[in-house]
């Protein structure tokens, strides 16, 4: 997702109209491939896992498939509908919770083997660092956070209380978007920004598109970090 829309994406209502664009991006994207590989190598069945801001279940579903018991926390009704649709045949072992991360008391979160959040903590009303602190305060055995680095607010502690970082990786990940037409790229820009582009902006959008096969592609990438902490007694 483009940096320009992170603040707009912090409201569940944003996703009511954005879900089709998210689905289209996911259909052609390999953004999560490395993330899934790492998280499924860390987790062990039958771990209890909480996925904060689960979206369409891109991380929850592989964990359920390997035998974990997953609570998918997703406050957007549109994204929950998508999650239920895509997890229709993989629901055993998954519980979908409509609450926001801010709405849950830490005392209700005891007993998790892993709490994970992928590009979701900065979308909370309390902000990235307080949301991360709340994960540690919930006392899971392990914490995994995936985040893009687009703001000075995104700061990653090596230690927090009795948690120590056990794994860290930062890499450039392709996040390109495929469109069926150049006009569709302009529509997507409008969905991102909440306004229609001017003539020069429209021309600039179209000038960045490259034709490959049946699609017009907008090249993009993101600096993505994956961090894992483990609790030590």
Predicted regions and their residues:
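Conserved class I S-adenosyl-L-methionine
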Residues: 1-43, 46-55
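Conserved Class I S-adenosyl-L-methionine
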Residues: 56, 171-233
């Amino acid at each position: 997702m483009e940096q320009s829309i992170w603040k707009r994406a912090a409201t569940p209502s944003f996703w009511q109209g954005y879900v089709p664009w998210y689905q289209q991006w996911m259909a052609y994207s390999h953004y999560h491939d490395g993330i899934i590989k790492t998280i499924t190598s860390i987790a062990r069945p039958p771990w209890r896992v909480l996925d904060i801001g689960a979206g369409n279940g891109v991380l929850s579903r592989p964990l359920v498939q390997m035998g974990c018991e997953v609570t998918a926390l997703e406050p957007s009704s549109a994204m929950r509908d998508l999650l239920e649709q895509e997890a229709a045949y993989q629901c055993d072992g998954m519980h979908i919770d409509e609450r926001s991360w801010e709405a849950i008391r830490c005392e209700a979160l005891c007993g998790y083997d892993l709490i994970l959040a992928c590009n979701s903590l900065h979308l909370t009303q309390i902000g990235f660092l307080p949301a991360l602190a709340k994960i540690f305060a919930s006392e899971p055995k392990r914490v995994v956070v995936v985040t893009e680095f687009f703001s000075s607010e995104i700061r990653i502690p090596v230690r927090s209380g009795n948690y120590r970082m056990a794994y860290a990786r930062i890499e450039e990940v392709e996040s390109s978007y495929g469109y069926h037409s150049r006009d569709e790229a302009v529509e997507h820009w409008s969905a991102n920004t909440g306004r229609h582009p001017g003539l020069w902006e429209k021309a600039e959008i179209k000038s960045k598109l490259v034709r490959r096969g049946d699609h017009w592609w907008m090249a993009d990438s993101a600096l993505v970090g994956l961090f894992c902490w483990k609790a030590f007694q």
